[in-house]
Amino acid sequence: MTKKEIAKFIDHTFLKSNATHADIKKLCDEALKYSFASVCVNPYYVKVCKEYLKDSPVKVATVVGFPLGATSMKTKIFEAKEAFEDGADEIDMVINIGALLEGNVDYVYEEIKNIVDIARGYKNKIVKVIIETSELSDQQKIEACKIVMDAGADFVKTSTGFSKSGAKYEDILLMRKVVGDKIKIKASGGIRTYEDALEMIEAGASRIGTSSGVAIVSED
């Protein structure tokens, strides 16, 4: 797979707390230059990105319940509605990890389903669900993937990039085994090189979340 082909898999990401308008403009310019799938930014910058990227195929993604997943369901619902109204094409939401660990699968399902239902009220909106694989056992990863599928989301995503570790090849293989072709997988966290990205794609990822997109597609 060429670097130009890999670029189509990349969500070009800048989720740092110190992001400025200049940083976001640069992010968008890079996404346009390299034809990345999307830019992924904090909600404050959704409108800005939508304006920068108008009339381009680059999508605008943002986050909900990020990075801990521990905000209330009502808060996540509000964040999702606001994001879509501001022009977001895609949402990366974090599940309530504690609820999953306690076995409260109904709550986790309901939370995701609410966001999915909001997305379906618009045209061509995507919901990706972050399960934070570094916090889960293999059995919990399997359970989380099944909940995400049942709730009707478009993607299950490995990581926020803010936890103990990010995407692992073995996790992508496991997740692909569970979800098959029913939903897609996004790998994120610690993907910094062309080799890292290619490994995740070969394992079954359809999208790569990284702040190293330019380095990945520009390596000699």
From Swiss-Prot:
User: Is Lipid biosynthesis tagged as a keyword?
Assistant: no
Q: Which GO terms describe its molecular function?
A: deoxyribose-phosphate aldolase activity
Alphabetic keyword roster: Cytoplasm, Lyase, Schiff base
Q: Which CDD domains match?
A: DeoC (cd00959)
Enzyme Commission identifier(s): 4.1.2.4
InterPro entries for the chain: Aldolase_TIM (IPR013785), DeoC (IPR011343), DeoC/FbaB/LacD_aldolase (IPR002915), DeoC_typeI (IPR028581)
Kindly tell me the pathway this chain contributes to: Carbohydrate degradation; 2-deoxy-D-ribose 1-phosphate degradation; D-glyceraldehyde 3-phosphate and acetaldehyde from 2-deoxy-alpha-D-ribose 1-phosphate: step 2/2
Location within or outside the cell: Cytoplasm
The biological processes this protein is annotated with in GO are: 2-deoxyribose 1-phosphate catabolic process; carbohydrate catabolic process; deoxyribonucleotide catabolic process
Q: Which reaction does it catalyse?
A: 2-deoxy-D-ribose 5-phosphate = D-glyceraldehyde 3-phosphate + acetaldehyde
GO cellular component assignments = cytoplasm
Q: Which residues are named in the active-site annotation?
A: D92 (proton donor/acceptor), K157 (schiff-base intermediate with acetaldehyde), K186 (proton donor/acceptor)
Which Pfam families does this UniProt record tie to the protein? DeoC
**Principal place where this protein is found?**
cytoplasm
Q: Write down the SUPFAM superfamilies for this protein, in alphabetical order.
A: Aldolase (SSF51569)
Tell me its family.
Belongs to the DeoC/FbaB aldolase family. DeoC type 1 subfamily.
Q: Which purpose does this protein serve, as stated in its record?
A: Catalyzes a reversible aldol reaction between acetaldehyde and D-glyceraldehyde 3-phosphate to generate 2-deoxy-D-ribose 5-phosphate.
What is this protein's name? Answer: Deoxyribose-phosphate aldolase
Which organism is this protein's natural source?
A: Caldicellulosiruptor saccharolyticus (strain ATCC 43494 / DSM 8903 / Tp8T 6331)
Q: What is the lineage of its organism?
A: Bacteria, Bacillati, Bacillota, Bacillota incertae sedis, Caldicellulosiruptorales
